[in-house]
């Protein structure tokens, strides 16, 4: 089993890196404001039709454009969900959503979280899925990538105020990156058996003689961007465990590759844009090493089985509860780590059925800020915050002014870094405390003891860090949970973007200092170790007490 796990992980990473490298070069051209070959004329027509002036923006103007863009998208999606019952492409005549569920869902998809307090096949019309949720999957992904474009330019430029044009970046990312990749992946899914139609649900009779409805819909098109944009919201309630979303072992592999493809490519693009490819590789190494460690722990925990059953003498050498037999325990464990490392939230197994330690690792990956590959864009700008924090810590130890890529990290930057890093832990810990203190919060707990607490902690962690996966034993389809998690998703997304853009605005105006003999190397093994240590230290200090009350207490109670 260990050899199989090693081969699965090694082959996955090899294929990922082979695909990500050329895509990184393409992304670097976009960051450098170079139109892709043959598309410059098309872009000029688009700017004219849309009334876009392709002039570069300062950080505040860029930020306001991003915020306005997402606010309008959220309002449009909220209205669509409320009016769903009177709109077309609704063959099952599904009613509009309640205001609190519509608000939760709109915030969820605008913030790239895709938390779902509903079952898609019994709640959403085809119009809501296509025009509402799928469109926001593209736009929320483009938002995250646009923000990291601006931050990367801030490191590459000097003595300037401009960071690019938000409308140009959003358009290019959507039309020339996300749409082509999604089309290719969707066509592959259709070939593998994923539905793509507008038919009404099909009645059929089971082998036992029972009558059921077979859900249909435009699944493949939504499935592709759900993964490539690290969105994660499933067309069906079972998400990628459903055979219509993820029918074969081959689609499962492609789904895992799609989740990490753009985050990995952005690391390569970062190195090219700042004219030092070693910097991008160092960040990628740090992410990969943490990822490998987490995969090993989850595979080990799940292949050991349930400790309580083992002590009773039952045959429980593998924990297959909540997993699809067509994927097996290793691929399910790998998928769980990928989806929580990458802020995706799609699942091909039920995380609530993992062992205590096996479920703790995905939770912890979210709690450290979704910086191990992370969401498209958000993962890299989140890791760059930790890079600057690590540089600052190293500067304190040797008594030198901290610098990264020739840019001095001053008091202003450190305040913004601290604010951005502390936003999500504050939301997670206070949100969990509020849920545990109130009757409305505890009413959603279907399990007592440490596991019930873990379900609450996981839900708030997932929302605040814009992941969207869940320990499904929590009844979150209530006004209390809809509003609490909507607040966490909204603040967890945009209260991080705001300081990141402020940092970009400060850095782009600074001069790039030439390297001196005393300059800290930020591309070697020593710095990679320092960066990993910084990420682990912040995660450990912040969440170990909460984890001790949940998954750790559950694990030791079973021994």
UniProtKB/Swiss-Prot annotation:
The keyword Transmembrane helix applies. The chain crosses the membrane at residues 5-25, 63-83, 131-151, 173-193, 254-274, 282-302, 327-347, 356-376, 379-399, 416-436, 483-503, 525-545. It is a multi-pass membrane protein. GO terms for molecular function: P-type potassium transmembrane transporter activity; potassium ion binding. Its main location: membrane. The gene is kdpA. It comes from Klebsiella pneumoniae (strain 342). Belongs to the KdpA family. The keyword Transmembrane applies. It comes from the Bacteria. It is found in: Cell inner membrane. The system is composed of three essential subunits: KdpA, KdpB and KdpC. Keywords: Cell inner membrane, Cell membrane, Ion transport, Membrane, Potassium, Potassium transport, Transmembrane, Transmembrane helix, Transport. GO terms for cellular component: plasma membrane. This is Potassium-transporting ATPase potassium-binding subunit. NCBIfam families: kdpA.
């Amino acid at each position: 089993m260990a050899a199989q796990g090693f081969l699965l992980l090694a082959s996955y990473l090899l294929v990922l890196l082979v695909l990500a490298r050329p895509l990184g070069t393409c992304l670097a051209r976009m960051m450098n404001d170079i139109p892709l070959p043959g598309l410059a004329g098309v872009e000029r027509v688009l700017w004219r039709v849309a009334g876009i002036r392709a002039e570069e923006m300062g950080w505040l103007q860029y930020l306001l454009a991003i915020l306005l863009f997402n606010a309008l998208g959220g309002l449009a999606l909220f209205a669509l969900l409320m009016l769903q019952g009177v709109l077309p492409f609704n063959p099952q005549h599904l009613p509009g959503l309640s205001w609190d569920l519509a608000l939760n869902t709109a915030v969820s998809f605008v913030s790239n979280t895709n938390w779902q307090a509903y079952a898609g096949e019994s709640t959403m019309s085809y119009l809501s899925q296509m025009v509402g949720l799928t469109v926001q999957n593209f736009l929320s992904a483009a938002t995250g990538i646009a923000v990291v474009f601006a931050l990367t330019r801030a490191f590459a430029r000097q003595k300037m105020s401009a960071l690019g044009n938000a409308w140009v970046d959003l358009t290019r990312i959507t039309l020339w990156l996300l749409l082509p990749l999604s089309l290719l992946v969707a066509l592959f899914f259709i070939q593998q058996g994923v539905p793509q139609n507008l038919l009404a649900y099909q009645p059929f009779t089971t082998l036992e003689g029972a009558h059921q409805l077979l859900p249909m819909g435009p699944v493949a098109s939504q499935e592709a961007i759900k993964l490539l944009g690290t969105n994660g919201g499933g067309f069906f309630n079972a998400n990628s465990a459903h055979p219509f979303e993820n029918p074969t072992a081959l689609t499962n592999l492609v789904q895992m590759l799609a989740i990490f493809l753009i985050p990995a490519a952005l690391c390569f693009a970062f190195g090219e844009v700042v004219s030092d490819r070693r910097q991008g590789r160092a960040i990628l190494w740090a992410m990969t090493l943490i990822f490998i460690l987490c995969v090993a722990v989850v595979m080990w925990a799940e292949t050991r089985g349930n400790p309580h059953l083992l002590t009773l003498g039952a045959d429980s050498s593998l924990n297959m509860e909540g997993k699809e037999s067509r994927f097996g325990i290793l691929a399910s464990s790998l998928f769980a780590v990928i989806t929580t490392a990458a802020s995706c939230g799609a699942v091909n197994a039920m995380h609530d059925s993992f062992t205590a330690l096996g479920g703790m690792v995905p939770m912890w990956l979210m709690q450290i800020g979704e910086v191990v590959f992370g969401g498209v864009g958000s993962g890299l700008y989140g890791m760059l915050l930790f890079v600057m924090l690590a540089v600052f810590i190293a500067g304190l130890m040797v008594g030198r002014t901290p610098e990264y890529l020739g840019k001095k990290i001053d008091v202003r930057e450190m305040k913004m870094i601290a604010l951005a890093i502390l936003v999500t832990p504050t939301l997670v810990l206070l949100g969990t405390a509020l849920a545990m203190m109130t009757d409305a919060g505890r009413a959603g707990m279907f399990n007592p003891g440490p596991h019930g607490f873990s379900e609450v902690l996981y839900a708030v962690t997932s929302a605040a860090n814009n992941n969207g996966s869940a320990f499904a034993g929590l009844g979150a389809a209530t006004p209390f949970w809809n509003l609490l998690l909507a607040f966490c998703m909204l603040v967890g997304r945009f209260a991080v973007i705001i300081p990141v853009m402020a940092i970009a605005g400060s850095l782009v105006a600074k001069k790039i200092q030439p390297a001196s003999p005393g300059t800290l190397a930020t591309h070697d093994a020593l710095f990679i170790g320092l960066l990993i240590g910084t990420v682990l230290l912040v995660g450990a200090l912040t969440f170990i007490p909460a984890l001790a009350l949940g998954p750790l207490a559950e694990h030791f109670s079973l021994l």
